Amino acid sequence: MITSVKKQGYDIIVVGGGIAGCCAALAAARENKSVLLVEKHINLGGLATIGLISWFEPLCDGEGRKMMGGMAEEMIRLAVGCGYDNLPEIWGGTSGNAQSSDRYSTHFSPTFFSLALDDILRKNGVTILYDALATYPKVDNNVIVGITVENIDGRLLYPCKAVIDCTGDAAVASRAGVPTRTYDNTQTYVVHDTNRRHAAEFVDSGNMTKLRHWQWFKPGAETIGEVTAAIENDYLRRSKQMTLAYYVGTDKNEREILTLPELPQIRLLRAIVGAETFLGRVEDIDKHVANSIGS
């Protein structure tokens, strides 16, 4: 029988080091809480970095008015602080490679953004535990009081006062018995590649987004329902086969895949059933949410 070794406790444990998890950990640390961030991969940023969706959605309304600030704006600044960008000049862009529109949005370097996330969390006192899988929460009287983690050291129990589930599929909440629901997903697969033509365009323009090119694939049906392990692995198998088939037969000395995604690029897996749900879909356009804290 494998027993759990009890480790140091924390005020807050954040499970999942995607953008949401990083923001949650940073916010908690700035409130002088002791924070442990548990991440199963070895780099931060989730879908935005190791998932290769390195595009920051607009923070404006399309008419020159900023609609979001706070940590969202802090993250877009962090994303372009050390790596390339194509942020418009009116929003502080300095690359000279802005998009044709003036939206407050940008492409960014997924690698530099991941490193920047690690840096800002450590500077704010967050303890990061990489290459660690949060398996099951410890629940006492319907309250999560700890997280069981498995890594190279074995099975560890980290006590806590509160847990923030940023796994992307409500893994902690679901295993604690919290009601959850699933959503339909569009199947896409993105890799970053380059070739001789892209390199020439970069040399001519100095625009790094010309060199790091997104290549999209559609490995299956338009939508899938609940994502199981079998469905996820089938999606990954088809995605990899489709990707390889696309490049086979092209000149191997003219092109290169720069990066493959290190996690499934699935947007909606499972979520906690909240008091209110707003997805921004067509059916939500006229929906009024009285307790919205956004714009």
Enumerate the language-model features and the residues they cover.
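Conserved N-terminal/central alpha/beta ligand/cofactor-binding core
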Residues: 27, 33-34, 39-136, 140, ...
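Short, hydrophobic/aromatic-rich segments at coil-to-beta transitions
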Residues: 141-147
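Basic/polar N-terminal segments that are highly enriched at the extreme N-terminus
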Residues: 1-5
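Beta1/beta-strand and adjacent pyrophosphate-binding region of the FAD-binding site
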Residues: 6-18
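Flavin (FAD/FMN)-binding glycine-rich loop and adjacent Rossmann-like elements that form
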Residues: 47-48, 71, 114, 131, ...
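Loop/turn elements at helix/coil->beta-strand transitions in domains of secreted/extracellular proteins
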Residues: 9-11, 31-34, 124-127, 156, ...
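N-terminal Rossmann-fold NAD(P) dinucleotide-binding loop
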Residues: 21
